[in-house]
């Protein structure tokens, strides 16, 4: 078998570095390249600037097989380049508005697609839909799926999620109730939720993540909600006040970036998925002891390994569509710093 050449664009960032570490440990035969805007110390460091298409030539020169995108690419230059050059592509960074644009662009080029194009920017590397499928394989039975997220400001945080919140906190986004899109805003519509892993009852507020789009528009689940709480009850209630009093509206973007951009030295992250059918409610709870970056990176590595196996034909996928959900569940469950609980 030929050695696979993998390029991680944004490989010097928080999640990119962890992807490279886990990939190298699990697959020493992969040939790993790091793409960033600065030149690096070795010939494995490629200058790749998503805003400068000329720099993309190095992707062809180095015979890259698969591109992992972990940086913002507003104009979808890398996606278009991958389609044109028949390269495998996985993107883990797109927030909902950008994801829908990229997905439409890929579908418009469907006839030209000869490689595997995978969108994996759902929560924590796109594993929620796999867990939903694992809990209830018959999607037609599911009436409602709710995701509850425990987000620690002490965790190591990448810039992309903080910048997304800073830029979009004042804009409405869509949740789905009985297949009717409803416009809501971040940090409103609070409810109480009892988290597992010793966290207990917390106020949770609206959050826009791509799983809203994926679970309703792709998986056809009629009602989908996502809500989050911060580890600090004070910070959580403060965000609620700021939104309800429209304080975010009068803040400069830089100020909002500072507010959302706080990052610590690492902390756990937790999310829980509630799946409701006509006659029962199921719940799966996941804790990543090492936080968001580790979980997102490990999920991404699972997708990369699947893409490079010879079992996946060319086409457009969301990451949960490339695996059996049992494979994903078992891989997560056996990873040393991830804990899973199931209540049926």
Give short role names for the model-derived ranges:
Residues 6-24:
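N-terminal Rossmann NAD(P)H-binding glycine-rich loop of SDR-like oxidoreductase domains
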Residues 9, 138-265, 271-284:
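Active-site-lining helix/loop region of Rossmann-like oxidoreductase modules
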Residues 35-39, 50:
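N-terminal Rossmann-fold cofactor-binding loop
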Residues 49-64, 74:
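Conserved Rossmann-fold cofactor-binding substructure of NAD(P)-dependent oxidoreductases
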Residues 65-70, 90-91:
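N-terminal Rossmann-like NAD(P) cofactor-binding module of classical short-chain dehydrogenase/reductase
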Residues 82, 86-100:
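ADP-ribose/adenylate-binding Rossmann-like module
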Residues 94-115:
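Rossmann-fold NAD(P)-binding glycine/threonine-rich loop
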Residues 237-344:
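C-terminal active-site/capping subdomain that shapes the small-molecule cofactor and substrate pocket
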């Amino acid at each position: 078998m030929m050695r696979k050449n993998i390029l991680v664009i944004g490989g010097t960032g928080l999640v990119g570095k962890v992807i490279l570490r886990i990939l190298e440990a699990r697959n020493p035969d992969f040939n790993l390249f790091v793409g960033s805007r600065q030149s690096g110390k070795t010939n494995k460091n490629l200058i790749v600037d998503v805003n400068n298409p000329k720099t993309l030539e190095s992707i062809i020169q180095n015979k890259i097989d698969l591109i992992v995108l972990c940086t913002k690419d507003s104009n979808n230059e890398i996606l278009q380049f991958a389609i044109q050059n028949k390269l495998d592509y996985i993107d883990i960074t797109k927030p909902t508005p950008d994801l829908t644009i990229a997905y439409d662009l890929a579908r418009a080029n469907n006839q030209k697609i000869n490689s595997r194009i995978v969108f994996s920017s759902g929560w924590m590397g796109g594993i929620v839909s796999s867990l939903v499928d694992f809990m209830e394989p018959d999607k037609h039975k599911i009436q409602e799926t709710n995701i509850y997220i425990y987000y620690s400001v002490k965790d190591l945080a990448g810039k992309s999620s903080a910048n997304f919140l800073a830029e979009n906190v004042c804009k409405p986004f869509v949740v789905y109730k009985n297949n009717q899109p409803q416009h809501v805003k971040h940090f409103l519509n609070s409810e109480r939720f009892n988290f597992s892993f010793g966290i207990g009852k917390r106020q949770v507020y609206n959050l826009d993540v791509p799983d809203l789009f994926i679970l309703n528009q792709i998986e056809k689940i009629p009602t989908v909600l996502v809500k989050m709480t911060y580890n600090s009850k004070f910070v959580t209630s403060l965000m609620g006040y700021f939104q309800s009093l429209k304080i975010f509206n009068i803040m400069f973007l830089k100020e909002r970036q500072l507010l959302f951009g706080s990052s610590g030295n690492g902390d756990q992250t937790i999310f829980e998925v509630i799946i409701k059918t006509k006659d029962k409610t199921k719940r799966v709870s996941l804790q990543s002891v090492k936080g968001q970056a580790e979980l997102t990176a490990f999920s991404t590595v699972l997708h990369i390994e699947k893409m490079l196996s010879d079992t996946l034909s060319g086409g457009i996928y969301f990451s949960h569509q490339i695996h059996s959900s049992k494979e994903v569940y078992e891989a997560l469950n056996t990873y040393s710093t991830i804990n899973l609980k199931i209540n049926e």
